[in-house]
Amino acid sequence: MIRFFAFVLFFATQELILCNNLPCDASDIAYEEITTQAGTQTNTFCDCQTETYKFSTGTSTDKQTTTVKYKCKKIRACVYAQKCGSLDVKPEENVLSTFCTCADGQVCHDTPEYADETRTFGDTKYHSFVCT
């Protein structure tokens, strides 16, 4: 009976951990992707306020399972006239990137009409932004 309750408690705790959607701390793993022959499963542990980066990749000894863990990028404060972000407008997608955080009272816009600089290469437009 004790084992049954221990199992139920363990399962419930895991579900709470995977569904909490709390903001990530700097050292937290945000999510992991586990790929097997059956497909890919994603376990989300917390929500990043920034973009993520691949932190580690592990492969099981039998080469049947690969686990990739992701953390949140650390965004530093912007210095004077530094590019705070960019928007790459491509035919198939738009990619918004953040490079640093603006000081209180300033904002890093994310629409082309507020771009500090715009360049076109092929069928892609690159817009960059500074804090205003």
UniProtKB/Swiss-Prot annotation:
The keyword Nucleotidyltransferase does not apply. It is found in: Secreted. Expressed by the venom gland. Its main location: secreted. Keywords: Disulfide bond, Secreted, Signal, Toxin. The keyword Ligase does not apply. Residues 1-19 form the signal peptide. One of its GO terms (cellular component) is extracellular region. Contains 5 disulfide bonds. Disulfide bonds: none annotated. GO terms for molecular function: toxin activity. Belongs to the scoloptoxin-11 family. This is U-scoloptoxin(11)-Sa1a. It comes from Scolopendra alternans (Florida Keys giant centipede).
